[in-house]
Amino acid sequence: MAMAGADGPTAGAAAAVRWRGGESLLLLLLRWPSSAELVAAWGAARASAVAPALAAASAACLALSAMLLADAVLMAAACFARRRPDRRYRATPLGAGAGADDDDDDEEAGRVAYPMVLVQIPMYNEREVYKLSIGAACGLSWPSDRLIVQVLDDSTDPTVKGLVELECKSWGNKGKNVKYEVRNTRKGYKAGALKEGLLRDYVQQCNYVAIFDADFQPEPDFLLRTIPYLVRNPQIGLVQAHWEFVNTSECLMTRIQKMTLHYHFKVEQEGGSSTFAFFGFNGTAGVWRISALEEAGGWKDRTTVEDMDLAVRAGLKGWKFVYLADVKVKSELPSNLKTYRHQQHRWTCGAANLFRKVGAEILFTKEVPFWWKFYLLYSFFFVRKVVAHVVPFMLYCVVIPFSVLIPEVTVPVWGVVYVPTTITLLHAIRNTSSIHFIPFWILFENVMSFHRTKAMFIGLLELGGVNEWVVTEKLGNGSNTKPASQILERPPCRFWDRWTMSEILFSIFLFFCATYNLAYGGDYYFVYIYLQAIAFLVVGIGFCGTISSNS
């Protein structure tokens, strides 16, 4: 009876569990491994798969870092030993009869001295800046009968189109030769507008074309300082000026951008100009010889970096480029984080996609020597357009944080400290006025490398969004005292609309790695990882740059 009484409640409880559908749960709990078994399983997986994979990634990143360092050293050396353009090329000022053989006809000599120049200004709904660029172009010191200002308006806002057309007519009434051109479609975006603009009949009389984006304001003597290089040196196809920024002090993000772009111009552009007479056209603040542009095949819209595409094709035809560091053109930096992201995606994705499209053409062309092809494929494209984006993210945001969790893998000190320090110093040498922003620049650039790496793979593999084109938002002259919200006249956005979960989640991962290293590690990686985690979090919650309704 006692035995039966004991069995009865037990059987009833088991039946109740089965009745509630809990039998499988009980079996799962009974079979669930203990903590010791889990630790042992993780140790085996870590030793057999995770650690070897991380070690391979570390070795690859270190090799790529060495490539970056070598390229940075060579470019820095080229800049310090630079050959000034005015010492390598003839660039005496233009004057009556200058640039032509002896000619008794003063009028004809003057026409040769001041060739016909076309100024193209592509724009798209540029409400805040259209007056700046049109006014600056019309104010260029050049004979009015030798200059045509062509405004290529792709605006979809009828109000903006009306304002731009009215501004063109206003300058036309002042005696300036201003042509207002519109299209029925936006096919090809900027490249399509520039290409169609060159098809106009009046362009046939022009020898050179200067291009300015809508927020660029050339100084009156811009043509007087650039055109002589083209007139005196028939082998030169492009003259590129330096960008100067009117809103550098607007926020920390614009200061960091200025450092990055200053290095790009002072090292990459200047180094390419003085060593190989080649660099990527920046799309604005430059003057092309129209015959060089046409020989290269004209504008193509196959990528979002139509300017670089044109430069590569012109370089393959043997045309030389000149960068003039002392000719500066005022422009505006994007001060809004979302706008800056779109710009960086377009530049990074487009460059990688162009590498994919022209790599074979560069390799098999017979029109340029081997060393020039090697420079273009290895240094210009692979190192600067691929490696430069992958290494900051993979090494400093993935491999190093993961290595604190995997004791079997140790990243050597030279790869963690010496190489990045040397590269940073090479950047700082050309940015002495902003050297105190170097720590912020490093952390912010590592965060942006997350987006650039993704954009690079999209372009290299031609994935979705490869031809995504978003016009960079411009707010007008940096001296404008009105806040951005008043300029844009748009309702403010909610703060959580600016959040990006990818950065926030990545910051959580970095915080975990840093805390683990602080608790169990024998080194001080947690100091850097904590700082990088904070940088990801700050960017992730949108607390970076100025705020507008598009943020």
UniProtKB/Swiss-Prot annotation:
Topological relation to the membrane, as annotated: Multi-pass membrane protein
Recorded catalytic activity of this chain's protein: GDP-mannose + (glucomannan)n = GDP + (glucomannan)n+1
GO cellular component: Golgi apparatus; Golgi membrane
Positions of substrate binding: D213, D215
Species assigned in the record: Oryza sativa subsp. japonica
Function: Probable mannan synthase which consists of a 4-beta-mannosyltransferase activity on mannan using GDP-mannose. The beta-1,4-mannan product is the backbone for galactomannan synthesis by galactomannan galactosyltransferase. Galactomannan is a noncellulosic polysaccharides of plant cell wall.
A molecular-function term among this protein's GO annotations: glucomannan 4-beta-mannosyltransferase activity
Pfam families xref list: Glyco_trans_2_3
EC number(s) reported in the record: 2.4.1.32
Enzyme class: transferase
Family designation: Belongs to the glycosyltransferase 2 family. Plant cellulose synthase-like A subfamily.
Example GO BP: cell wall organization
Transmembrane segments annotated in the record for this chain: 60-80, 386-406, 409-429, 504-524, 525-545
Entry annotation: catalytic residues: D154, D307
Keyword terms, alphabetized: Cell wall biogenesis/degradation, Glycosyltransferase, Golgi apparatus, Membrane, Transferase, Transmembrane, Transmembrane helix
Cross-referenced InterPro entries: Glyco_trans_2-like, Nucleotide-diphossugar_trans
Residues of the signal peptide: none
Full protein name: Probable glucomannan 4-beta-mannosyltransferase 3
Record's subcellular location: Golgi apparatus membrane
Domain of life: Eukaryota
